[in-house]
């Protein structure tokens, strides 16, 4: 049933791996109490917010027990779309989030017809103030309980920092970092209280090195890595899995349509579907970092050996805009 509801090429990659991800083992807290800071937030904390701020009216409340779901942001393209295809194997209900209703409806139709899964569609632009509050309210109004949270929404662009607009920098940080943090804050307490759940935060190998001419984007991915590492340790005792996905370049139609298709770099890219398989498997195993692909692993390894000034110089030489 269908109901209405990264990043640049450098952000996504894949891993040589066979098989499909298994279902994450559910760990339980037993008699261990949940700290006060992890208690569930007030479900009606923002009654004054307009219902249609994100582009759709809140779904009508449902009766009965909450429906467990996997919520995927940035669901309509690249890694996000492939993650949806993987998650339907272990989740009967998907909540997909994106900016384009048309693309979301197309994806929902595809998933529901191919996998016989219940798909809920939510339109939201995370760069807009208050968008997360409205999304969370809509999800709860639909009687959905987020069992797996996938923070995949994000974007980036290349330009000298001093020459780029502050408004665009703010939108990048809001989308890549603040929205991710707010969604974790909204749903992690419920997961901890239940004693199970999973959070997959999509970072990038870009977060391991400085990124001249893409400084804010690289820094935003470093935040995702650091934040996920801390969250991993805090939520692990409560049975909640946390994984930071740190891919490198992903294979896109560009490689098939351009002369670059047979270059060495093109051969090092991997498909988004293989990235998704690696990510879901890592989350099931509660691995903190997932860096799929040869190139991604090489970048991560090299970042630990090379001085940061050297790494910054190398990134600058690759990313400096041509005049």
Roles of regions detected by a PLM:
Residues 113-129:
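Rossmann-fold cofactor-recognition segment
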Residues 184, 220:
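Active-site helix of classical SDR
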Residues 244, 264-299:
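C-terminal helical subdomain
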Residues 160-161, 168-171:
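Substrate-binding pocket helix/loop in short-chain dehydrogenase/reductase
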Residues 204:
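Residue(s) in the substrate-gating loop at a strand-loop-helix junction
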Residues 76-77:
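Conserved glycine-rich cofactor-binding loop
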Residues 91-106:
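Conserved glycine-rich Rossmann-like NAD(P)H-binding loop of the short-chain dehydrogenase/reductase
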């Amino acid at each position: 049933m269908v109901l209405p509801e990264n990043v640049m090429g450098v952000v996504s990659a894949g891993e040589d791996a066979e098989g499909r991800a298994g279902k994450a083992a559910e760990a339980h807290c037993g008699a261990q109490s949940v700290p006060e800071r992890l208690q569930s937030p007030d479900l009606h904390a923002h009654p004054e917010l307009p219902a249609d701020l994100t582009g759709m009216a809140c779904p009508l409340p449902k009766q009965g027990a909450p429906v467990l779901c996997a919520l995927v942001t940035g669901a309509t393209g690249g890694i996000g779309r492939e993650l949806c295809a993987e998650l339907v194997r272990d989740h009967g209900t998907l909540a997909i989030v994106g900016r384009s209703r048309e693309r979301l409806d197309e994806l929902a139709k595809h998933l529901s017809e191919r996998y016989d899964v219940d798909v809920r569609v939510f339109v939201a632009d995370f760069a807009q103030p208050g968008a997360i509050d409205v999304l969370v309210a809509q999800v709860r109004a639909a009687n959905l309980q987020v069992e797996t949270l996938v923070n995949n929404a994000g974007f980036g662009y290349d330009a000298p920092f001093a020459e780029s607009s502050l408004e665009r920098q703010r939108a990048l940080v809001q989308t890549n970092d603040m929205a991710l943090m707010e969604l974790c804050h909204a749903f992690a307490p419920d997961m901890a209280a239940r004693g199970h759940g999973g959070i997959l935060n999509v970072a990038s190998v870009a977060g391991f090195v400085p990124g001249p001419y893409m400084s804010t984007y690289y820094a935003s991915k470093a935040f995702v890595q650091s934040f996920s590492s801390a969250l991993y340790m805090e939520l692990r005792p409560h049975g909640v899995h946390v994984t930071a996905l740190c891919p490198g370049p992903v294979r896109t139609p560009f490689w098939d349509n351009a002369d670059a298709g047979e270059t060495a770099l093109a051969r090092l890219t991997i498909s988004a579907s293989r990235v998704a398989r690696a990510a879901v498997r890592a989350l099931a195993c509660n691995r903190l970092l997932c860096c799929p692909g040869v190139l991604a692993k090489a970048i991560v390894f090299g970042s630990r050996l090379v001085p940061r000034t050297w790494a910054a110089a190398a990134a600058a030489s690759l990313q400096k805009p041509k005049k």
